[in-house]
UniProtKB/Swiss-Prot annotation:
Signal peptide: none annotated. HAMAP family: Ribosomal_uL13 (MF_01366). The modification N6-acetyllysine is found at residue 191. This is Large ribosomal subunit protein uL13. It is found in: Cytoplasm. The keyword Magnesium does not apply. The modification Citrulline is found at residues 59, 140. Belongs to the universal ribosomal protein uL13 family. Phosphorylation at Ser-77 upon interferon-gamma treatment in macrophages involves a DAPK1-DAPK3 kinase cascade and is causing release from the ribosome, association with the GAIT complex and subsequent involvement in transcript-selective translation inhibition. Citrullinated by PADI4. PANTHER family: LARGE RIBOSOMAL SUBUNIT PROTEIN UL13, RIBOSOMAL PROTEIN L13.
Amino acid sequence: MAEGQVLVLDGRGHLLGRLAAIVAKQVLLGRKVVVVRCEGINISGNFYRNKLKYLAFLRKRMNTNPSRGPYHFRAPSRIFWRTVRGMLPHKTKRGQAALERLKVLDGIPPPYDKKKRMVVPAALKVVRLKPTRKFAYLGRLAHEVGWKYQAVTATLEEKRKEKAKMHYRKKKQILRLRKQAEKNVEKKICKFTEVLKTNGLLV
């Protein structure tokens, strides 16, 4: 991958810890990483167990002054960001610089809706978990511990998918019309095509 190029990852269907470990390594190597659809990230283990773990974490606070931390994030993107932070030496200059190269988002807002999104096979749930194993969605966990924007994100995602579907239909129609137009003029331009081919201008 070229230096300065942004790696856009689709978080949906990936396991939280495995994806975080790979992302942490990439940002330390100097690559810019954007993770979209963090609400679709999976966590291994059943939902109830994961919720109990997070509720136990919410009780961790500074007795004398809770505003000093630890801070408990509710948005799926921030929960994922904190997981990655735990895998980086974030109190050093190198770790801070690496963390600045990471961008996390709920849903797929512009301009990332128009960009090619990648997956990480080594972190995919379907590859890593047995089909019978239980798992939870980070979006649902976040919603049940205080994230307020689950419905908003879902609505925006539906709109984006509908828009993408329409764009794909339009693209297919244009390709079909182009093919038909080429077929219509094939006989008329065949002699010119032959000349171009003999001169090596057309392959």
